């Protein structure tokens, strides 16, 4: 933020500070810091997942949500996502632990929303055995709804037990 003059009644102006770029096939667009409200929405969305609250999750995403999972699976639409989550919650009891989130604005008219890049660990419990992955999610939020996200994943080693020392 900067002032338009050095007077006591100066107007404060919002200024986008360049923070990288995004390339498409046809152009390159500047990035700047995005709206913190998008990070807060994503945190609430993850909290709803940890609580396995399908009603809240569905209220926070667009009808046409697209999810590109780390295993190459593409899920399109709320109904398909709800069905997927219902089964996954029962089978693996997933739990997320966020460790960073950054909102980014693409200065491009075709994307008026905010991207959130989020780092988190995801712990699954299948047949009593826990496994954890480190993940990065790129999330697009527009009009107060999660529109799409990509997840990139890395397997983390199992913690060493006290017996192995």
Q: Where in the sequence are the language-model features?
A:
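Short, low-complexity N-terminal intrinsically disordered segments enriched in polar/charged residues
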Residues: 1-51, 59
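Short beta-strand edge/turn micro-motifs at domain boundaries
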Residues: 1-2, 132-160
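A short gly/proline-enriched turn/hairpin at secondary-structure junctions
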Residues: 27-29, 60, 66-76, 91
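Hydrophobic pocket/interface hotspot
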Residues: 45, 56-58, 65, 77, ...
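Sec/Tat-exported extracytoplasmic proteins
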Residues: 46-53, 61-65, 85-93, 126
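Short beta-strand segments enriched in hydrophobic/aromatic residues
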Residues: 61, 120-124, 137, 153
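Surface-exposed, charged secondary-structure patches
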Residues: 84-127
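Short, solvent-exposed mixed-charge patches
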Residues: 162-165
């Amino acid at each position: 933020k900067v002032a338009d003059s050095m007077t006591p009644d100066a107007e404060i102006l919002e200024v986008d500070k360049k923070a990288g770029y995004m390339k498409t096939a046809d152009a390159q667009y500047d990035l700047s810091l995005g709206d913190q409200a998008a990070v807060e929405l994503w945190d609430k969305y993850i909290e709803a997942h940890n609580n396995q609250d399908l009603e809240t999750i569905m209220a926070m995403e667009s009808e046409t949500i697209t999810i590109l999972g780390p295993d190459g699976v593409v899920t399109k639409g709320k109904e398909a996502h709800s069905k997927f989550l219902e089964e996954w919650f029962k089978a693996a009891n997933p739990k997320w632990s966020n460790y960073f989130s950054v909102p980014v604005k693409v200065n491009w008219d075709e994307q008026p929303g905010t991207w959130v890049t989020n780092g988190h660990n995801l712990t699954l419990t299948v047949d009593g055995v826990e496994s954890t992955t480190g993940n990065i999610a790129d999330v697009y939020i527009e009009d107060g709804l999660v529109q799409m996200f990509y997840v990139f994943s890395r397997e983390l080693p199992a913690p060493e037990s006290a017996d192995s020392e």
